[in-house]
Amino acid sequence: LAKSAISAQISIPGSKSLTNRELVLSALASGPSEILNPLDSRDSNLMIQALKQLGSEIESTPNSLRITPRPISGPAQIDCGLAGTVMRFVPPVAALAKGEISFDGDVAARSRPMKTTVDSLRALGVEVSGSGLPFTIHGTGEVVGGELSIDASESSQFVSGLLLVAARFKNGLTLNHTGKTLPSMPHIDMTIDTLAKRGLKVSKLSETSWQIEPGEISGRTVEIEPDLSNAGPFMAAALVAGGTVTIENWPTSTTQVGNDFVSLLALMGGQVSRNGTGMSVTGTGEINGIEIDLSSAGELTPVIAALAALAKSKSVISGVAHLRGHETDRLKALVDEINSIGGRATETKDGLIVEPADLRGGLWKTYGDHRMATAGAIIGLRVPGIEIEDITVTSKTMPGFELLWNKMLGATS
């Protein structure tokens, strides 16, 4: 519970999305790479272990990772945990190996959408047994590539996973997305951007079609930006408690969807402005409802829904049907938890409606989902007696979340 207005400067750890993309590219590169300010979390550690299993040498120092690529080789057993990036980015890498590579993860991971990854590898001539986790790739040491059509409606990670590895396919790859919707387009732009910085040209043939020629992926030294999606709960805190929160080292240009918080929080009543190298949000404690299509930035939904539950007017969030296949069914989880503490939330076919209500304390369940935990923390700033079931699930992408949260609350104005 925030006892008074906040005045805090927060340094957020590195971006998970960027860390895991750069790790994959470093493992596939023609020479060594160094990643500065990488995220140290369960998801990034699972990625490191997976790439080590496939032959890469990865040495970690306190603020960097040094990656020396080696031939991708099996046999190996890959633990995906609950990390979508591991389960969807590593199989195309493993397909380049000779031998059997088996994949499994947490029990909850077995229900996450994986069929598109498996089907796409089969369509490229890779032998795969199983249709979702657990499954095994029987690699021959090369992937021919060519043209491929997939339906990535459930996750843009299906597209990114193939694009990251495509330059190592014998004939490169022309990839077409055939589904009606393509969520989280900025994540694909991020993938294309990381490839370009390593000397690879991705031709965007259309909004849903990409081409990569075979070629060398160069090693590089790269500094990882702070994770702007993880900055969201801290920025939201300024709107809930009043006061100012500044996120340090906010990038001047970025492909991260978390950058959308700048415009979203302004719409909900925050004053958002650049402050030197940081981004500051000032709030009064009064929150406006919002009508917004979050199809390109679905992972921001839990923060926006938490603010909506505390807002003075109705909110409608749309374009996020794909959240049903995240760490948990996030739409159902958000509605259930908001309503369990006296809120008025309803699920729609592709989102949520949240209406103003008097909230009361109670248990906020986390469903093993880091973003459900941080959504509960936001509501707990204003509503006395909110108990977060398991705050440790935040370590999936942000170890030390609760320490930083308490430090922010200690820094009152």
Regions found by a protein language model. Give the residues of each.
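Short, structured segments at the rim of ligand-binding sites
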Residues: 1-413
